[in-house]
Design a protein with these regions (language model features):
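Alpha-helical transmembrane segments and their helix-start/interface "positive-inside/aromatic belt" motifs
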Residues: 9-23, 90-97
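Membrane-water interface of transmembrane alpha-helices
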Residues: 35-36, 69-81
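Juxtamembrane "helix-exit" motif on the non-cytosolic side of transmembrane helices
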Residues: 38-42, 79-80, 108-120
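Non-cytosolic membrane-interface motifs at loop->transmembrane helix junctions
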Residues: 47-54, 89-91, 116-131
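Hydrophobic cores of alpha-helical transmembrane segments in multi-pass inner/ER membrane proteins
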Residues: 22-23, 60-74, 129-146
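Cytoplasmic juxtamembrane regions at transmembrane-helix boundaries
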Residues: 79-103
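Hydrophobic alpha-helical membrane segments
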Residues: 94-115, 128-138
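Hydrophobic transmembrane helix segments
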Residues: 25-58
């Protein structure tokens, strides 16, 4: 089933640019979290605001680095329309767009839970925001072949 909303851009380069912007935002989040964990500059929120604690940071950081490497390969693949990551089938693109909807919906539910919680039970907002960035990246990636 075709997703109800997809991103319609004029060229592979346009999709790659959107994906690259989202990639840079995620990279800034990873760098910000590293700085918060290691040097704690006063101009950044403290580490506790960057980190939900769902995965120990010693595993989270390498996972984020792997994501960044794969995301770079995806951007380059889409821009060049080259295999393996830039030449998806339309079926794969539809699945990825639907997955981005589910991902964003999960983060919307998490955001609502955050907003309704008492301040001492709220958790952290920064990871939620950047999960939306990742959902947007998937949305653009899947849309690039539709």
């Amino acid at each position: 089933m075709a997703p109800p909303i997809v991103l319609h851009l004029s060229s592979a380069r346009a999709y790659a640019v959107v994906m690259a912007v989202l990639l840079v935002l995620f990279l800034l989040r990873v760098v910000g979290q590293i700085l918060a964990a290691t040097t704690a500059p006063s101009w950044l929120p403290p580490m506790a605001r960057w980190y939900s604690g769902l995965m120990p940071y010693r595993y989270l950081l390498p996972t984020q680095i792997v994501f960044l490497v794969v995301m770079i390969a995806m951007v380059v693949g889409v821009d060049r329309r080259s295999s393996p990551l830039g030449t998806l089938s339309a079926t794969a693109g539809r699945w990825i767009v639907w997955a981005s909807y589910v991902y964003a919906l999960g983060m919307a539910a998490r955001s609502i839970r955050y907003a309704l919680a008492t301040p001492e039970r709220r958790g952290v907002l920064i990871p939620i925001i950047f999960h939306f960035v990742l959902a947007g990246f998937l949305f653009a990636y899947g849309s690039s072949v539709l």
